[in-house]
Amino acid sequence: MATIDTPVKTSVGGSGHAPVRAPRARRGRPGSRLWVKAVVALLLVVEVYPMIWMFLTSLKSNDDYLNNSTWSLPTTWEWSNYTEAWTTGNIGLYVQNSLLAVVPALALMLLLGTAAGFALQVMVWKGRSLTLLVFLAGMMVPPQMILLPLFTVYFQTGLSGTLWPLILTYTGTGLPLTVFMMATYYRSVPRELFEAATIDGAGILRAFWTISLPLVRNALLTVGLVQFFFIWNDLLIALTFTNNQDLRTIQVGLLNFTGDFGATQYGPLFAAICINVFGTLLIYLFLNQKVMKGLTSGALKG
């Protein structure tokens, strides 16, 4: 007759099987954890210290910067450097021009890229795979190769001397990456949602506006933020098409900042750099969590 073995309880000095202990989780050596913390601390210093130094330098007078140690604190805190950079250095105008070029280009890029990603991944039609390859091929074209032809086209069409060359060029150069990323995010959206909407009588436009856009809003925010940093930090395209001082973007303005003062004024110069750097950094810190959600949502298959 078959029997079932039962565990025998053991006592001190008793007989029977020794109790089996659950394996302990392997812990790293204290020395290795210390090295990891040291490396993280070093990377943090490398990233944060230049910003602290830049901010402190922006509060120094020109004599303080030239005559005292580079690592010293300001002898007098010159907060007026920010006012001087914003008004005399025209940083306020350059920020305005950057926003006037970036916001319309970003809106066009996201609208067209999202619609193209929806058409390439949700809608069924012949040639969509080839069309996606064409967009991917656009990512391989360096912007430097098309600047001269675009400059000729804009000059002949009378668009030179406006911000339209920047808006159109930013939209065209950023559209391939936007289409590719949005198509990747749409791939993770369950097809059953769109099939159910079609059965309920929803058309393509309604499915796009009311169903797809709410599902990919985190992806839209992520792609938009990535493209925003690319466009905001651009120097080459802006330098090519802004031949008027009143049309300079923030990066071109910083490049010519010394010329506007006639001589290098280090306090206002670093104040202008701080306005540019910390402004974009605050945007990222404010939207950090949504960006992380958007980065991971495209990797999950619904």
Model-found features: residue ranges?
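Short helix-coil transition/hinge motifs at the ends and kinks of transmembrane helices
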Residues: R21-R26, D260-A263
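A structural signal for multi-pass alpha-helical bundles of membrane permease subunits
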Residues: R33-G302
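Short, intrinsically disordered terminal tails adjacent to the first/last structured region
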Residues: M1-R21
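Intrinsically disordered, low-complexity regions
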Residues: G14-H17, R29, A263
